[in-house]
């Protein structure tokens, strides 16, 4: 169960290279260096993400990206559910970059979801807005998607830089909630631990992504545990946020009774898959009992199994 992956970060490098060649484009040296593991800067990550995302210009490409996410799941195993909670940024693709229409984005997702369903994989879609663009942007995102929202669009989230307090975003989250969407937020990723508290108490967020800064305030760990707020953990993606696996807060989260699930985040950019994330999780030193609990909660709290298609 991949609890957190972004459509825009899912295209496989080989597909991107082929598509670039078809369009007579060269893959930037910085992007190739990042894929080879020779470049590690945030600038290299962004350059790679933006270049690959630039090929999401048709419904077929969108379906390919979702298919790539499905391929990164573990192989089928009796008794283990397979699913993806998929984050997408339609406003960025449709309005800001103007590289695909909303109709073609929905069509590609519908095709990809149907193909996944035939493979026994359930998919739910979460709409992502950008915190540092502010609440007005959040309302624009909802304006775009709520009019003809497919049934598999089940959630609303914010990402980006955590510069705007969640109390300012509260009306946007409330509008999304009233429209029937579940609420999530990237918090405690690049912002202070207090952003996690704000997201939960002031914006009504039901699920937190990353939350690596939560360990800085024991009261926030207690809040997450007491309210049973699920946390999406993306170990490879978090490599720039913690010194190493032995410093990742996942073991502390589980020991504190926090419900967690594993995700790949931007697997086509970071070159990771879910089996690899499980290996990294075990590398943090969690016990077999904690690993079993992590596996169970990854599925139990996944929106694709609760209300997804």
Regions found by a protein language model. Name each.
Residues 1-181, 190-195, 202-203, 207, ...:
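Metal-cofactor-binding active-site regions of metalloenzymes
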Residues 186:
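Short HxH-centered metal-ligating active-site micro-motif
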